Swiss-Prot record:
Its EC number is 2.1.3.15. InterPro entries: AcCoA_carboxyl_beta, Acetyl_CoA_COase_Trfase_b_su, ClpP/crotonase-like_dom_sf, COA_CT_N, Znf-ACC. One of its GO terms (biological process) is fatty acid biosynthetic process. It comes from Pectobacterium atrosepticum (strain SCRI 1043 / ATCC BAA-672). This is Acetyl-coenzyme A carboxylase carboxyl transferase subunit beta. Keywords: ATP-binding, Cytoplasm, Fatty acid biosynthesis, Fatty acid metabolism, Lipid biosynthesis, Lipid metabolism, Metal-binding, Nucleotide-binding, Transferase, Zinc, Zinc-finger.
């Protein structure tokens, strides 16, 4: 018997039991490292309540938060990717597709829905970054064109949320063709005078940034989103110079006039609805469901800065 056991009366010792906390209840902010309650983070649309860092959001979660709850219809869900080239690098392309579909629970890297935004008819496309880095390939291009065609048929606006590493190398030239294909489709929107708003989220790179992501009548970015063609590391290695702080981030781009505005995610739904109301002569929506943190910088304070 140890000396401590001799001192303490065993009847006063209460055995402790290890707490059993289910997995996935807590998560950590990628920016500030703060441990966060996942349910609270989801209520805040993936925005850290401590530092306002905008974490990556799945395509369906983004669409569900953006559109009205009623009357949403998914478009192009029957389109599935095929390994036409029988491509293989370190792994077969068809095996990569199966793995990506299991990981993301999506058939490909874009989800398209039509519905309403504050009662206004609208078509919305959103990239799924969890599917092979949101890379643009044949199905992504086909679904985006389907979104454009639906907007033309309904005579309504189109909004696209981009989150992509660029063109998918496993589809080679066919993936590069989607840059021209999507750009040509958007030209029809412009001919009809229908608004197209592009929302650039972290990251929007490569062939996506060089085509549909930067062709909006208004180009909006989320705070601190990485936006560009080649990545900063590649550029530094090429030009052999140190890049300025914040290079290719949305705050840097708005200073250079490359984008039109920066909008926080909780305010995105109301802001886009207000802009579309002005562009389409619809009545402006009420802002009852806008969530604005008192300790976060507002859009007006960003402008003043």
């Amino acid at each position: 018997m140890s000396w401590i056991e001799r001192i303490l009366n065993k009847s006063n010792i209460t055995p402790t039991r290890k707490a059993n906390i289910p997995e996935g209840v807590w998560t950590k902010c990628d920016s500030c490292g703060q441990v966060l309650y996942r349910a609270e983070l989801e209520r805040n649309l993936g925005v850290c309540p401590k530092c306002d860092h905008h974490m990556r959001l799945s395509a369906r979660a983004r669409l569900q938060a953006f559109l009205d709850k009623e009357n949403t219809v998914e478009l192009g869900s029957e389109l599935e990717p095929k390994d036409v080239l029988k491509f293989r690098d370190s792994k077969k392309y068809k095996d990569r597709l199966v793995s990506a579909q299991k990981q993301s629970d999506e058939k490909d890297a874009m989800v398209v829905m039509k519905g309403t935004l504050y009662g206004m008819p609208i078509v919305v496309a959103s990239f799924e970054f969890a599917f092979m880095g949101g890379s643009m390939a044949s199905v992504v291009g086909a679904r985006f064109v389907r979104a454009v065609e639906q907007a033309l048929e309904d005579g309504c606006p189109l909004v696209c949320f981009s989150a992509s590493g660029g063109a998918r190398m496993q589809e080679a030239l066919m993936s590069l063709m989607q840059m021209a294909k999507t750009s040509a489709a958007l030209a029809k929107m412009r001919e009809r005078g229908l608004p197209y708003i592009s929302v650039l989220t972290d990251p929007t790179m490569g062939g996506v940034s060089a085509s549909l992501a930067m062709l909006g009548d208004l180009n909006i970015a989320e705070p601190k989103a990485l936006i560009g063609f080649a990545g900063p590391r590649v550029i530094e290695q090429t030009v052999r110079e140190k890049l300025p702080p914040g290079f290719q981030r949305s705050e840097f781009l708005i200073e250079k006039g490359a984008i039109d505005m920066i909008v926080r995610r909780p305010e995105m739904r109301y802001k886009v609805a207000t802009l579309l109301a002005k562009l389409t002569n619809h009545p402006e929506p009420g802002n009852d469901d806008v969530e604005i943190r008192s300790d976060a910088p507002s859009e007006s304070s960003q402008d003043d800065a």
